[in-house]
Amino acid sequence: MVHLLAIGQYMQSHVLSIVIALLVSYGIGFLWHGPLFGKLWMEYNKITPPKKEDRKFSMMLPGLTANLVQVIVLSAVLGRTFEIVALAHVGHALLIATILWLPFTGLTIVNSYAWEGRKPGHMALDAGYYLVSFLAIAAVLYVTL
């Protein structure tokens, strides 16, 4: 219970850090699912890009909202963890983010995609996105501690 209160206090005192982490996460998402791997990601997900006149911002709102919640929770938990362990340098922040990503996101994606019969490339693309995002958020939180 004490740590839940501490996470809440962290969120209140580090609003700017969380907002920066959110913006960085959105930036990575737009690059990853756009110019870097957008065509491949759409191919894996069997998505036909809508015509330019049919594209609406509202189509992205569910995903953006889910990402908002994820980044707020991840930032609060990572930030509080960083306070507890008193990090010596950014490498420790990146290591902790990787350790948390591996069982809770990376392997969850692998297990889910394996059962769904998805291609290994699809698995790697999505798991890689989350790893890069976790690492970027960890770096932002470390720099703004």
Language model features: what each stretch is:
Residues V2-L145:
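Juxtamembrane/disordered regions of integral membrane proteins
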